[in-house]
């Protein structure tokens, strides 16, 4: 009897692995053999798995930047407690801006936190995106003045993190800044891939 083609076996294994519901189950399966690990760590497989099994809500980041973990009887409570113990929600690993103004949390998405530092009535802000668990950060360059000041100076700029797209790398991110002018609204987009702002 001929052996099945390797790609067919891989496809069957993928379908089996897609039925595993937790990251812990995937991690255990990936340690069984190199073939399982190769299949499970493939980006397209992980994307499909995340679509079928969205990550659990582990907690909330409060306005002051502190983390409120999920509590029992929530099934995510042990993982949430572990996250609270391991991550740095004081953001001490992010350098203080040159202005000396402390960081404030503006948005949280996909495990990343968008921080900003600005004085009252200041529209152009210092911004950073960080991962409190891995303690990595990216300081965003300022929005170029030639982009921000079109016909007039913006009244306010509201930054938000964009959700990760299906075709995007898990390490990349985008920040959207909505600039509010007297008579119009303009969106500026920062991409971690290009490290630049665009309209």
What are these regions (language model features)?
Residues 1-199:
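N-terminal entry/capping and adjacent linker segments that precede and initiate structured domains
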């Amino acid at each position: 009897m001929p052996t099945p083609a390797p790609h067919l076996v891989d496809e069957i294994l993928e379908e089996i692995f897609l039925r595993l519901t937790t990251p812990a189950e995937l991690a255990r399966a990936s340690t069984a053999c190199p073939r399982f690990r190769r299949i499970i760590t493939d980006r397209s497989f992980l994307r499909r798995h995340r679509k079928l099994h969205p990550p659990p809500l582990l907690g909330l980041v409060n306005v002051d930047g502190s983390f409120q973990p999920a509590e029992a009887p929530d099934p995510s409570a042990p993982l949430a407690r572990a996250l609270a113990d391991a991550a740095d929600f004081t953001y001490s690993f992010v350098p203080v801006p040159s202005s000396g103004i402390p960081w404030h949390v503006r948005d949280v998405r996909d495990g990343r936190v968008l921080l900003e530092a600005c004085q009252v009535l200041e529209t152009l802000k210092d911004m950073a995106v960080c991962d409190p668990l891995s303690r990595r950060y990216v300081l965003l360059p300022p929005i170029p003045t030639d982009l921000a000041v079109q016909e007039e100076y913006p009244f306010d700029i509201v930054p938000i993190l964009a959700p990760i797209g299906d075709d995007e790398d898990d390490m990349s991110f985008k920040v959207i800044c909505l600039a509010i002018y007297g008579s119009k609204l303009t969106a500026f987009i920062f991409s971690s891939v290009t490290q630049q702002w665009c309209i």
